[in-house]
Amino acid sequence: MPESNREDGVHEGNAAVTQLYGEPFDSGLALAEQHQLAADLTAACAVYEQLLTLAESVEDSPDVQFLRAHLLANIASVRLTATDLVAAEDAVERSRALLDGIASAPMGPRGRQLWLEMTLRTLLARADLLRRTGRLDEALACLDEAALRLPEFDDPEGLRTSELGLNRVHLLIERGEWGAAEELASALLSTTPATAVETIPRLLIALGLICASTGRFDPAEDYFARAEDALRATGDTGELQSLLAHRAYTAMLRGDFDLAEQLFAEASAFFERQRQYGDLAVCEQARAFLAGRRGDSTGADDLTAASLSRFEQLGASIAAADTMLLGAQHAYDRGDITEMQRLAQKARDVYQAREVHERCAQVDLMLARTIEDNLNRTDHGDHERTSVDNALSLALPAALALEAARYGFATAHARSQWLELADDAMRLVFRLAVRRQDQGLLFELVEHRCAGASLALDRTPSAPPPSPDGDAAASGETGESVSVFPSAAMKVYGHVDDPTTLGGVAADAAAAAGLRVAPPPKVRMSQDSGRVALQEYIAAAEFRYHRRIVDEEEVPFWITDDLTSRPVVQVRLADAGDLFITWTWAGGARGFGTGHGPAEEVDRAVRALAAALPGPGAAAEGIRQAFASGAMTDPRTEHALARELAEAVWPEGLTAQIRQVSARAGRPLVRIQPSPRVAQVPWELLAVDAESDGRLIDLADVVTTAPTSLRRPDPGPYQRPALDAGVHRDPAASPDTDTDTVVLVLDPRIPGFRADSPLGSVLGPPGSDPELLAFVQSRLDAGAVVPSVATPAEAFRRTDLDRDWLSGALRKGARRLMYVGHVSGAPVEGGQSEDGTLHLCCGPGTAGLAETVRTHRPLSAKDLLLGTLPLRADGEPGARIWPAPPRVALIGCESGGDLRFAESFGLAMAMLHNGAELVTATRWVLPTSFAFHRLAGLPESVRPLSAAVVAVDNAHEDQDPVGRLGRWQREQLDHWRSDGRIEHSPLLWAAMTCIVV
């Protein structure tokens, strides 16, 4: 057996002749490798076959058998690249048999290492082969066997470790486990040595495919560009052409069909010349889809038939089924329903047999869409209800599975991008429910949609202790996902009950990336019947597609036990194309209802609101525009906006019910859980009366409610149970409140920022505002205040209020926390509400999860939730470090912007998660009193922001904080309607809202 070691991957050695077996074998191996680099696979295979023939003529011995195994492994590699899967399988099996035959032969330490290396290569090649032919369980078993062999192999640079990890990434992609694949690939990329010149570009390509397949096209192109640079550096012509096909696939998903057609045609020509028929079949499949889009039915059918034939010849059963599904769509487009059903069922049978459950969901969604399309085209008469029922029985379980796929992603950004793809299926479901006029189903759909994801602290990896052997090759955690039809030869697969394990390095990367979430709890619709929202559809989805849709834990859709003192209506809104609304009454009133606002009207009204508010750019410029031209600064334009919003998002029937209840039982409380699209709507301001200037706040008190997932019967050891009816209770009556302390964080001085800078003072010089000084003095007179101050002025612009101080103050116990200062909201398009931050006196050396800003590290919602779990092996969750008191006020720019996100884990929700019962926060960027003075010409003696701070403080001291704040807001509204003075503009006071669970 040869006694020198080398990396035998095609690109991870070099083309120079390496002394291994002697001539002519060494020079022949170098020549074949050159052919492979040049993508001349036929020539490379011919050289290997000649060498194998020569080796078989040499007298048999363990060394000769090893040489033959080496040559067969190389032949298998070339055949795999050429997608000659039958010949590749034969070569792999023969190589493995030869290696097994000499396993017990005497060999020195170096010989044993060479045998192990060749065995690993053969196992990885076999796993690749099994994956390509759809035998995914066998492929995983093969990788597991390789992992068992790996510790014995001397791999100081981690080349084989990274190669094994790459194969796991490919298998996760094949299964559609996009989240787990992304985690593992990212972790591998950060740990793979630069000498792994073959593995690195393939990892980059894998990450690009993951991003493209989940709707993140710019990051995908960035990964592809980096991969291209690496491939050009090694001269890998063949892989560059494969990259071209991946870019074509991305262009197709992005909707750039002309570019996709051009790139696929170029790649197809190359693959056909090189006889890489599997890659050619993938291109033909995609080109068939493109031909169908441009109306070339003949071309689409021809390309589909060619792709299907090639996949079947190669034994790529799942890819063949994908092409059948595409053919089924073409058959439907030309009116051949029988052929559509035949092909769809045949594809589904393959997916079912291979346990590719998510692809089964894609078939079911396609069938449901065809039923809806047929309903739109033809009159089903008496059979329409049956047709709609059939479509719903297919679409709703599949849509639930598709939506639930997001829980495998490690970041909220990736999950939000995935939801943009998955929402199309849920919009279909809502359309069908409306068509069936099923108010009960619509109610349950909205309840499930509004339940919200659950924070999965138990899945948040903590920083691992140093490991001597590392774990870069460990597989990613389960995160099944599905591809959106049609996706060229992208197969999906998943086992809910068989998660792989996230290794230490991958765990660390995941913790740095973002929050982990889990499915929402079951929403119990009735205490008496025990019915769970969508229970039969959830059961069908979990049975058909083997995916967890909801958590085992149940929560009531609304806790009404303590709501007997006044009538209360819970309103929830959900986005599904149109805006869907449900409401139900309690507290002495009974009834429920549903409604919906057409998407165009809602979008138009929301755009008008956005134009009236401070813009998304620099805060100063946005506020300047709001004062100069915004509708909120003139009573007439403000009323027109409030009326437009009411007509678009508020049901007239609900207004009528509120009037009836109010006349009979007194002012009701309206609890509103908005959808992300309408989360900035100032509900109090809605002009609900077409004949007068009556507003919703004239009829009722209004409070915002958090997603149901925050309402858990057993919140665990990290937080105090949140009390749903806390808006009616005296904080002193809470059994968990054992202190009278009020924690005040008032305009803290931020390191590195002067008073007149972007993160400078929001309240002005300490001691300059008599109203604020009087407010602090009243708190000092009433009881304990933290920080301890001798005079009210000392409470402002302090430099010692950092996160450690805040932790100590909150751990000692408090009944209230009031923060007035800078808040930086997370960009909605990023999808990560947990990136919202408040600004304390923390310097750059402070440990935390937010990036530093100059010489300052902000405190993020992610910090408040995860605490130090991602930073230390002995880390604590945020609820232990910063336990929130019952009432919290966060008066800063868009501090309550959480609900604008699909996953609400911003500052306000973090406080509720950490134990708060009520959080007062703001819906949009707040103008300071200084802004009113400079931009609106208000006298310096009038300080609107100070008045708002005092109003919130008074409300939090009241037994009914929502009612007290509402009275102040009605007073402001009355002034606004009577005199129209800018200090009474809703631009400030309508931003305030109380949020409860």
Predicted features by range, described:
Residues 15-19, 54-65, 98-117, 149-159, ...:
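Flexible helix-coil transition and linker loops at the boundaries of alpha-helical arrays
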Residues 35, 55, 59, 99, ...:
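Eukaryotic all-alpha helical interaction scaffolds
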Residues 420, 433-437, 886-997:
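Active-site-proximal C-terminal subdomain of hydrolase catalytic domains
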Residues 800-807, 824-917:
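Cysteine protease catalytic core and zymogen-processing segment of caspase-like enzymes
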Residues 427, 436-833:
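Domain-scale, conserved, charged regions that form catalytic cores
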Residues 26, 63-70, 114-121, 159-163, ...:
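Residue register of alpha-helical TPR repeats
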Residues 60-65, 104-116, 155-159, 317, ...:
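Acidic, Ser/Thr-rich low-complexity linear motifs
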